[in-house]
Amino acid sequence: MEFKHVSYLWDDAKAAQIKDEVDLFIYRSNLLGADLRLTNYGGGNTSVKISDKDPLTGEEVEVMWIKGSGGDIGTLTKSGCAALYLERLRSLKNVYRGIEFEDEMVALFNHCIFDLASKAPSIDTPLHGFLPYKHIDHLHPDAAIAIAAAKDGKKITEELFGGEIGWVGWKRPGFDLGLELKACVDEAQSRGVELKGIMLGSHGLF
């Protein structure tokens, strides 16, 4: 596969040799971070949702692996990730008191930790957790930011992508923004549209 402005680095043969889903997530992340046209150093984050065995109950549970706070996806390793019980993370909406209390939600992420060796979860964790997709990439490509920061960014996004990329206006990253991303996906699905991504106003691309 060839692209005009970015390099397509994915190697099907190499990916096929990676049997562990978390390792494959790391491989994907490193490729995205290798091209600074896709995201700036230290910017963006990636995630994968997998099924794993709960060490206490032995039951299969859904776990989300995500780049931890800080770090760079281009050099990401497993030790730089956070792994969280997805059901616990999503249940935090039951105690969410509103946008004025975003900071207290970050502390509650620690109650959702699955892997005790996890790095601290980032403020973007709910943005990934509330979306229903297995693989999620959040990047800051210069081209996307040019659209996201434009005065008519929403209109430009609709015209360029024909409704396949949603739009959510700028808001500080955190729990409330995660709920807005989910609402954007839900609204599109109610119209029979499956979004391929979401443009975040003055921010970047999901």
Map each language-model feature to its residues.
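Glycine-rich flexible loops
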Residues: M1-F206
